[in-house]
Amino acid sequence: GGEAAPAEHSTPLSLGEGHGGEAVHGGEAVSDEASPTKSGFYGQFGGAYVPEILYKCVHDLQDAYLPIIESEEFKQEFRTLLRDYAGRPSPLYYAKRMSERYGCQLYLKREDLNHTGAHKINNAIGQILLARKMGKTRIIAETGAGQHGVATATVCALFGMDCEIFMGKTDVERQHPNVERMKMLGAKVHPVTTGNMTLSDACSEAIRDWCCHPEDTFYLVGSTMGPHPYPDIVAKMQSVISEEIKWQLQEKIGRDYPDYLIACVGGGSNAAGTIYHYVDDDRVKIVLAEAGGHGIDTDYTAATIHCGTEGIIHGARTLVMQTDDGQIKEAFTISAGLDYPGIGPMHAYLAQQGREKVLAINDDEAIYAGYELTRTEGIIPAIESAHAVAALRKLSFKPSDVVVLTVSGRGDKDMNTYLTHKDMAKEYGKF
């Protein structure tokens, strides 16, 4: 049996719900829309639907997280590690040649330049500090592309903590370098052989492990999914991305907001971080790219916003790819990091409200965009990030439009995929 907190339908969500409208780093109060109600709802999405054995774990975390992450001590420690260990701020880079191609002013938020090669480290640092302050000694995590697994194994090595990573066997095979990195960092990697053997199954397995070790174990969730308070924790840890975009734009163009924000979305953490400080700013259009796989009219897709219906997955009410009788469908995409049959409840809500425009990007479009960015700017993006780059082709801009696109990770882990599918890259694939 799970706990269903009452859905609250007030829009916009009032700050009176006691969910603290402050960003992790202080600064101005953050939009209502980016934070859930006290019971963890964004509109009708979210909440905490967990088995009874996890009830105490989840409640303890709900009670503990805000006082800890809003404390000066935490903020100071978090900021210092982001700066000195992760290498933040990440650059906001004016992509001149891509700007000329698309007739806009394109800036790339370079999360690929963080330590470990993606945005995932921001959240891993924040959550391990939280776990330590809560007295937990063992860390578990799920991973798809392996980036969150690597980031988690990295911070566990940094703090000398036990680390176990659950990863679908399919992903273990297609992301081999990251598996070896995790092992080198001292993590134990469990290949998951249930279901489709990808990210969703890894999450289920991690939750099972958490059920068996509720006292000493902290589940370090990698995306804005799972039971409340995880979507809010991850969004707050990643909000450093949009916090930096604000001052970096101010420095570069004399105003602190773009006309467009573009990011890829699977569970939704880099997207949440990219839009966090802009959700209530109507001057900013938000465009997210989800994984279309072979196409949204096929059974081989991971486009949850396009193809999902309301349901419960991994402890949250959100949009889910499911059969008519509520069985969760397998998600298909070339990108291990977007291979999730659900979506963070914050994004389900914002998409439903029309605040986010969500485009489905197919495998071939993503591969093409990865080659295009590589040949045009000398930046090899992760296949996940290439989905965001592909969104540029589907939009029309004015020359004055300022567009900020988050390159969520680097493409080293995907070289095999890029080479195997180079025929999808048209003129770029001939080498």
Task: Describe these PLM feature segments.
Residues 110-123, 139-149, 195, 238, ...:
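Active-site nucleophile and cofactor-binding loops and adjacent substrate-binding regions
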Residues 115, 131-168, 256-270, 286-289, ...:
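A short, small-residue-rich loop immediately preceding and capping a beta-strand
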Residues 284-289, 391-431:
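Catalytic phosphate/nucleotide-handling subdomain of diverse soluble enzymes
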Residues 33-35, 41-46, 63-136:
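Positively charged, low-complexity intrinsically disordered leader regions
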Residues 140, 148-206, 297-308, 417-420:
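Active-site-proximal loop->helix
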Residues 203-229, 233, 255, 280-283, ...:
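Active-site/ligand-binding loops adjacent to catalytic centers
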Residues 117, 121-127, 141-159, 173-176, ...:
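Short glycine/serine/threonine-rich phosphate/pyrophosphate-binding segments
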Residues 16-18:
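Glycine-biased, low-complexity coil/linker segments
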